[in-house]
Amino acid sequence: MKLRKISAVLLSMAMAVSMAGCSSGGGGNAADTGAAAESTEGAESTDGAEEEGASAASKDTYRVCFVARASADTFAAWLTSEMKAAAAGYDNIELTCVSGEADDNTENGLLEDCITKEYDLVIVQSNNNAAQAPYVQQLTDAGIPVITTNPTTHQDDLDGSGDNSVLTGTGTVDADPIAQAQVGAERAVEEVPENANVVVLRGPSGNFHAEKRREAWDTYFFSQREDVNILYEDYANWNSDEALTLMEAWIQSGTHVDAIISMNDNMAAGAIEAIRQNPDYVNADGTTNFLAYGVDGTAQGCLLIKEGMLTCTALQSASDLAKKNMEYASKVLNGEMAITDVNDYVDAPEINAENVDEYIQIYVDNGEISANQLGE
């Protein structure tokens, strides 16, 4: 089936295509993926204070750095691609993209580098909220405006105070991880068979979205379905390869897995790949003997739904996140608003077999899926 081939191709390609370093807008040069690109000289932007905002507004080009968490994370790769596209719409913004490669030390080093290179504004996608929070604070202390995105960095991440407000001095553009996971969890209450055995794939420990999505499954599914048995649960860190390895080991027990509960589409895809050729899970006619739930609504996830392998996902639109990030970055840099006034969230609509064609068409239109690959 062509869709199976497409899913496999996306699984391997998504990690490489979007995370190449970028410099968009203002005619900038390409940046190195693993470290911040060399910066041009320029005055630091401010936190939106009136007199400093007026000074910032006089610059011809603003240098913005997006620090993504990992190139192997298909959503982070998608978000990077969309950041480049959104930045291209602003003539006075030069965007540099770098990746922390799912390593806290690497990402923290990149955040320190943003201070050294005096970026005018930094957009941070943390790998581990608590690990990155002190370095986000260093950026704000240096007078560099910071927007945290996917996930938000909270005050509690810095000081353990239990204060879940946005980290002091920063702004955020995000999605609600509880609402995202609630989409699949509520469906699963009705769909998962009685006394089912399920496996749970978790994102990185300490990551706000990973933890809150898992909490949502407790609230909206496991508390309602006490008959369900969690056969295995482990951290696959948003990574499809790690999920594939875990699933290959789990099915060796011989106990049938009735449902895959994954905190993102990428891990779900890896687990599905592990059982794709197993007749206990996929029949000769392509129908399945398992359910699978994801989050993110990636092109890969949509194709798996179309194929009948993924039951549903919740869209976390990287396009919307990127557009909002760049819109607010522009307003802050041009002195139109304070960084602390940036507080916006995107919706999480459900994608399932009934409406997946609508979302696949979006990916065809933006080039992430080709019409030829779909056989159209």
What does each model-identified segment do?
Residues 1-63, 88-89, 137-144, 368-376:
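Short, low-complexity disordered leader/linker segments with a strong preference
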Residues 57-59, 107, 170-198, 243-244, ...:
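Hydrophobic alpha-helical segments within soluble ligand-binding/sensing domains
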Residues 57-90, 96-114, 119, 125-130, ...:
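Extracytoplasmic "Venus flytrap"
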Residues 58-61, 201-209, 220, 224-227, ...:
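Hinge/cleft segment of the Venus flytrap/periplasmic-binding protein
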Residues 65-67, 118-126, 145-150, 199-200, ...:
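Periplasmic-binding protein-like
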Residues 75-89, 180-184, 208-228, 242, ...:
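Short, solvent-exposed amphipathic alpha-helices that sit
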Residues 134-179, 298-306, 311:
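Flexible loop/hinge segments that line or gate small-molecule binding clefts
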